[in-house]
């Protein structure tokens, strides 16, 4: 079980200022979380193979292939600004 002093220490390390009410709230919440983790530690998982994910994940996106587009000027003309044959976009990074 976790006590208020441990919550204060964690708050100090995280540079958080907690009110007494928040200290009490987090003491209760963290205590509940740790109790639940303790219940999980009691489970027999010796026959469960290690996994990285609970379900199989597959890539559902298409392969990234270059496709030529015949009307390049139509695309460029729809841009708010262009410079030659390129889109002109606002600068977002400093030159530093």
UniProtKB/Swiss-Prot annotation:
Pfam families, A to Z: GatC (PF02686)
GO molecular function, one term: glutaminyl-tRNA synthase (glutamine-hydrolyzing) activity
Known catalytic reactions: L-glutamyl-tRNA(Gln) + L-glutamine + ATP + H2O = L-glutaminyl-tRNA(Gln) + L-glutamate + ADP + phosphate + H(+); L-aspartyl-tRNA(Asn) + L-glutamine + ATP + H2O = L-asparaginyl-tRNA(Asn) + L-glutamate + ADP + phosphate + 2 H(+)
Keywords assigned: ATP-binding, Ligase, Nucleotide-binding, Protein biosynthesis
Protein's GO biological process: glutaminyl-tRNAGln biosynthesis via transamidation; regulation of translational fidelity; translation
Keyword Lyase among record annotations: no
Keyword Zinc-finger: no
EC number: 6.3.5.-
Function: Allows the formation of correctly charged Asn-tRNA(Asn) or Gln-tRNA(Gln) through the transamidation of misacylated Asp-tRNA(Asn) or Glu-tRNA(Gln) in organisms which lack either or both of asparaginyl-tRNA or glutaminyl-tRNA synthetases. The reaction takes place in the presence of glutamine and ATP through an activated phospho-Asp-tRNA(Asn) or phospho-Glu-tRNA(Gln).
Family affiliation: Belongs to the GatC family.
Subunit-level organization: Heterotrimer of A, B and C subunits.
Record-given protein name: Aspartyl/glutamyl-tRNA(Asn/Gln) amidotransferase subunit C
Record organism: Trichormus variabilis (strain ATCC 29413 / PCC 7937)
Native organism taxonomy: Bacteria, Bacillati, Cyanobacteriota, Cyanophyceae, Nostocales
Gene: gatC
């Amino acid at each position: 079980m976790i006590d208020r002093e441990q919550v204060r220490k964690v708050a100090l390390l995280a540079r958080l200022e907690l009110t007494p009410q928040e200290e009490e709230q987090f003491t209760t919440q963290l205590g509940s979380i740790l109790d639940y983790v303790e219940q999980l530690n009691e489970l027999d998982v010796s026959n469960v193979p290690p996994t990285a994910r609970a379900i199989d994940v597959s890539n559902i996106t298409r392969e990234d292939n270059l496709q030529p587009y015949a009307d390049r000027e139509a695309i460029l003309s729809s841009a708010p600004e262009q410079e030659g044959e390129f889109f002109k976009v606002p600068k977002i990074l400093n030159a530093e």
